Amino acid sequence: MADVFLFDTSVYIAYIRRKEHSELVDRSTESGRVVLSSVVAMELYAGARSVAEKRLLDRFVESMKMVSAYETPREDDWARGGVLLERFTRFRGHALVRDHFRDVLVILGAVNRGAVLVSSDAHMANWGNILKRQGETLRLKVL
């Protein structure tokens, strides 16, 4: 069975602005192997530069919902995320919740779906180590 990918915001921004990672994003999307996190969608909406970009995003989000490929945080993800943030703070010595809570929700979305999280942010590997200590597995591809 082929992997399903959940691209984080960094990948979509590089794809939209600079056409980076286009082969992976296009091929995965065309073959129906992409899950969109509602948290990633929120960040993309926040960064939309034009009405045209917003409309394109509207169509993408709706199409992902239609094929049940739109992942929203589950009720228990908020508490799980808090525990992970506490562990991350202990691991790193300090962390600001505002800097990481969205990452945690995206990560948990990938874990919940069994998807490979694709990111251009190498720091995401730290979360994989923390999840491993909790008995969970983050499948991660850093570009």
Where are these regions (language model features)?
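Short linear capping/connector segments at secondary-structure termini
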Residues: 41, 61-65
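Short, contiguous strand/loop micro-motifs
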Residues: 12, 44, 92-94
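Generic structural signal for small/hydrophobic residues in well-ordered secondary structure
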Residues: 8-9, 44, 81, 110
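Short, well-structured N-terminal submotif of metal-dependent ribonuclease cores
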Residues: 1-36, 46-62
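Acidic, PIN/NYN-like endoribonuclease modules and their adjacent C-terminal/linker elements
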Residues: 2, 107-143
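Short, well-ordered alpha-helical scaffold segment located
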Residues: 11, 40-43, 123
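Active-site neighborhoods of divalent-metal-dependent phosphate/nucleic-acid chemistry enzymes
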Residues: 69-123
